[in-house]
Amino acid sequence: MRDLKTYLSVAPVVSTLWFGALAGLLIEINRFFPDALIFPFFSF
């Protein structure tokens, strides 16, 4: 059980969560602003 906890606390799980969150964020941005090269909330 200790080995399992050690494995779950290292890079594969952290990177999977990070890339999953990043992919979700990019999907949501592209859902609200499809094919946007310039985002409206950055222009002044």
Curated annotation (Swiss-Prot):
Keyword Chloroplast: yes
GO biological process, one term: photosynthesis
Pfam families to which the protein is assigned, alphabetical: PSI_PsaJ
InterPro entries found in the cross-reference section: PSI_PsaJ, PSI_PsaJ_sf
Top-level lineage group: Eukaryota
Topology term for the membrane: Single-pass membrane protein
Compartment(s) where it occurs, according to its Swiss-Prot or TrEMBL record: Plastid, Chloroplast thylakoid membrane
Keyword Transport: no
One Gene Ontology CC term in the entry: photosystem I
UniProt keyword annotations, A-Z: Chloroplast, Membrane, Photosynthesis, Photosystem I, Plastid, Thylakoid, Transmembrane, Transmembrane helix
Ranges annotated as spanning the membrane: 7-27
Major localization class: plastid
Family per record: Belongs to the PsaJ family.
Function: May help in the organization of the PsaE and PsaF subunits.
Name the record gives this protein: Photosystem I reaction center subunit IX
Source organism of the structure: Phaseolus vulgaris
Lineage, opening ranks: Eukaryota, Viridiplantae, Streptophyta, Embryophyta, Tracheophyta
Gene coding for it: psaJ
